[in-house]
């Protein structure tokens, strides 16, 4: 288990969330302006909600289908405050919104999900630790904090396995399949040469 999990559970994220629901006509603040934010905004509009996007990019896909956009870095507290003042509830398009921004917004408006959930989802070791702690079956896994640790992790788990970057990998990026003949130094480089996780390969019939 990685040492980060106890910190997650005791991080003390506070929020302005009384558990209330929001009727059509409310404004949903979406952190992130990509394709997922665009789909969220379009679905929300069909249900009668308005959306306000916060994104560092001026012409993001989500901002093209919403009436309001705040264009600013995720660490701009003045812009975050103006954004919070303009919306009723905040959600996140993707998991890699900085912790500090999520926590800042949660002190001003309800957030869905809560910041600690975002914190867990941002890092694969935290995800696996959290799921294991709560009794959810996961494949065998080991942290790979440095290149030298990869050899021992492969020895313990054995190929086939998947080496993944702990953060920011998606759609197959930052992932390398480890077979018996894989050059581990090359695999480490292709993964990104950063904190990683080695997961035993799962023989599954389908993904639902």
Regions found by a protein language model. Give the residues of each.
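Conserved ATP-binding module of the ATP-grasp superfamily
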Residues: 137-139, 160-163, 176-208
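ATP-binding N-terminal substructure of ATP-dependent carboxylate-amine bond-forming enzymes
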Residues: 1-129, 148
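CheY-like receiver
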Residues: 82-83, 130, 152-153, 187-190
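Glycine-/Pro-rich loop/turn segments that contact NAD(P) or position catalytic residues
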Residues: 119-160, 167, 171, 175-178
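Short, structured secondary-structure boundary patches
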Residues: 71-77, 114, 131-136, 159-164, ...
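Solvent-exposed alpha-helices and their adjacent loops that cap or buttress functional pockets
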Residues: 19-23, 62-63, 154-155, 167-170, ...
